[in-house]
Amino acid sequence: MKRYATGLAVMLAMALATTPALAKGVFDGTWKGDVKASQPAEKPSIILLQAGTFSCTTCKPALKFPADGAFHPIVGNPYYDEASVAVVDATTVKRAFRKSGKTVAEATVTLAADGQSSSSAFVDRTAPSGVEVTGTTVNARVAPAPAGAHALSGAWRETTDTQVSDTGLVFTFAQDGKTMAFSTPTGISYAATIDGPPATVTGDPGWTKVALKQTRPTTLFETDYEGDTPIGTYSMSLSPDSTTMTTAVNDLKHGKTSTMVAHRQ
């Protein structure tokens, strides 16, 4: 399940054809994630910008490089292989990411006047299709910046004030028997057999396989993989009126849990 650029998950739900209601394709169609109705992860991200060095201990892989505005090599991230951080002033920092020499993501992070929240206006082009996801991530401070560090240092937790473009929230799926097809505006897609073996995911370098397991007539359990390594699980349930999907997300890669909501369009 593709995560949009903020780290929150965009939901999908799948159905098993052996159940009469599901055989009618009640999940078929277009859905859209609702950030306001969702519950972001409680576990914060930890950033330190001090003595000319940027570090992120909660990033995967952990990051540490000079905050000099130049690009520095990053090993182990499927979405980018270079990153840069530039300090604009006492309350603003710019970040950028490249892959194979091409800029794939940019963000301008700004501290609020009270120092207790920050906003990150971002453009994400990490999908191989090049389709952009844009928006503004809004974070609340959980722990203060250490003495002598830039004011944007500290521990931060995402809030429901975050805004994301439809390209990062919308998804479509269609059921044919026990096969569920999934697609997004950014070009991510798969066709997976429910209760079958892992299927190939295309269009996302960090999400390469998916496995679906039916747990109840209107609930499906999904496991996502990067290669052969599980990176997340999603327990997706349909509301009684079939207009809302609620997903319990377990981000195994980052050790975070959250609850995501999507509505039928």
PLM feature spans:
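Bacterial N-terminal signal peptides that target proteins for export
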Residues: 1-8
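Hydrophobic small-molecule pocket/channel-lining residues, especially in calycin-type beta-barrels
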Residues: 23-265
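Bacterial N-terminal signal peptides
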Residues: 9-17
